[in-house]
Amino acid sequence: MGSMFFKRARMAAGALALLAAALPAAAFIGNFRGPKVDGDLAVPGLSAKVRVLRDEHGIPYIFAQNTPDLIRAQGFVTAQDRLFQIEGYRAIATGRLAEAVGEAGLASDRQIRLLGLRRNAERHARLLSPEARDFLLWYAEGMNAYITAHADDHPVELKLAGFVPRPWTLEDMVTVLHFVNWSQAANFKAELGMQKLIDKFGADKALRDLLPMNVNPDRKLQPVIVGSAGPAVPLAAQDIELLAGLDEAAAPMAPLAVGSNNWAIGKSRSASGAAVLVNDPHLDARMLPGIWHPVGLFTPDIQAVGAALPVVPGIQVGRTAFVAFGVTNAYGDSQDLFIEKIAPGQPDHYVDGNQVRPFQIIEEVIRIKDKDAPGGFREETLRVRATVRGPIITGPTSGYDGDTLLSLRMASAELPGGGIGIDQLLTARSIADVDKAAQAMDVIYFNYVFVDKAGGIGHRSTGRVPVRASRQGSHPKPVGSSDDWQGFIPPAQMPGTMAPARDWVGTANNDTRPDGYAFDYSSYFASSYRIRRIAEVLEQGKGMRTKDQLALMMDAQNLQAPRLKPAMVAALQADAANADFARILEAWDGRDDKDLAAPLIYHALYERLVYETYVDEMGDKLARNWLGNWYAWQERFDELAKTPDSPWFDDVRTPQKETLPDLVRRSAAIVRAELQARHGADASKWTWGDEHRIYFFSPLRRSGSGRDWLGFAEQPMSGSGATLLRALSPFMGGFNVEFFASMRLVADMGDDDKVEAVVSGGVVDRQFHPHQKDQLPAWTEGRLLNWWFAPQQVEAHAVKRQELVPR
């Protein structure tokens, strides 16, 4: 989870001394010990007793006699372990953060209320099927049992952050699902970026030279560039920087938008003779205890072990007795920006084709904690205007009051179906059943990869993606006389494959559309380097064991580097001042190893080279903004490097004509000066790990004194944004790692004792709790832990035993 809702906690805590001073000693010690997890505990709402066993890592394994009690108990146990986290999720997702933390949460609340996530969720909740409604309500009932009946057991962090827990409703649950949907969406940001480029260069040049290049190694026709024929309108008078707040609104769960790897191998490639599922979701999970909550779920009909997102029932990654499944972000384009016009002389109306319509006006009242206000709160009314497409995201409230506006249309706002899909995963018995469940997921945009006990493997992308008459969603489009959205891609025609002949399947946020795909699914995907490495290894894989799958997750081989390294070496060999760079890079095998000098030189040089290529024409602000979105430009730039005399490499600020080698040498001089200042003159003694580092922090102390004590000490890390060992840093923002494998999991359907997995943190979100970060040593060392699957193994390894008793 991101930083927004923890700002208040960090400000309030300041230092550990505040935590100790603000609370009675008994409360402080209770927080260290954590929730009561042994003995009997009364739980309102249960129909029968439920047993909860915990292993040495604190992972709960829940044994219930029926499904309703199982999911209620999961909600209860999740609240025991993660109440601080789930209350933060709700405050952000519902636009009620300022009510808890005051002014620090107001900007987030304004943006969330403008988007209307709660309004959309309330409509969605009314449409849910009885099965979906029950599944969500059972979980809410369990959380509420802990919130209302065990207030003396709540974590002290709630008080520090200003949260006052209250019972969860069905609408709260659905709102969180819609927030997950929003936080996964990346096309909105990409559309804004492309509009800025259109404003700068004009539509022809921007769409011809700068649209993302989408590569699927399995396609014969390469590459695909979509949207180039679509209409584009310059908005030069419009300062769309004013929209930056909408991007920031997704920050609290923006980690969900980044990436992941998943793959599966069939029987012919595994040592066990059974199918194997592998998943390592890439998120910003530096804030402890991480995002995923490991859990085991057992009834007479259900046997499941894996990881769940707190507030989402069931498991999102893991296995059952019959199937296993894992997820990556699919980047299905579910949002569009539309260029709207205010009706001449009618400021409260807009032009819709040949009609003039009144804006829908929605008033959102935001409650803000304020010690100087009567009763401790003040109120602000936000006036939201909306067209038939969606809310206006520009206008007087953002400081712009022209006659051209942008509206945001979201598929999640357009009455999804009654199912949620996630409730079907626990009872799926085959890959066909998982595929059916995936097709029912309207508001979650994942690439599911899955396997079954019979050896079947498959993949399906989820969510609702509009069928666009314009066949483009890459940049804002003017409102026309007819609706651009002509329904949605049929779920069975979303990208996917079942039982491929090669007996493996994988995704890495890449373009998975085959040749001739009929729909404009998206214009925004990860570069192809990770999926190419997966294919390179799995195509040769025979008799693969769990250790082989782990080795592939930890693989630091960079397949992007060979595209640029030869040009870099050639340019540097002609430059005596940088001959050592040339020697180091030429000898490099392409591994982004933390102990090598070459990766540091390569990545620093690559980033500077890309920046120098575009800054002369874009300017610093636009260049950094666009290049900060790696997926938007990387394949495009790497292809551009094949043409070293491209006009883009010419610096228009100088009288001479520069080429790629000239910019390589210029960039090398800048990089050398920066790195020498930090690490000394001898480049051969530098290492990637000198700068490419990762740290984990407590919500109470993100930086400064005590950060490593409350969190987990900073350390060097191998990998990069282009490797399967994902370790992505912000563009030109230093090399500290922000996005990485938040969990690593291998589910071998031939091993009925266990799933082997690890999370980048722990189970419990309480400061100083022994299970807040106890899986990090294994994670940093590249080891997997046993998450027990067989009930007898759970019994044998239980160190805590609790019975939840109906009340």
Language model features: what each stretch is:
Residues Q335, T397, T404, V443-G541, ...:
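Hydrophobic alpha-helical segments
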Residues D69-A107, Q111, G326-F377, T381-R383, ...:
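Gly/Pro-rich active-site capping loops and adjacent beta-alpha segments
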Residues A257, L297-G314, G318-V323, V327-D484:
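Glycine- and hydrophobic-rich flexible loops that cap the catalytic core of alpha/beta enzyme folds
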Residues P24-V276, P281-D284, L288, V295, ...:
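Substrate-recognition/specificity elements adjacent to catalytic centers across diverse enzyme folds
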Residues L605-G689:
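Charged, long alpha-helical assembly modules
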Residues R118-R119, A140-E141, S412, I420-F446, ...:
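Proteins synthesized as precursors that undergo proteolytic processing into mature forms
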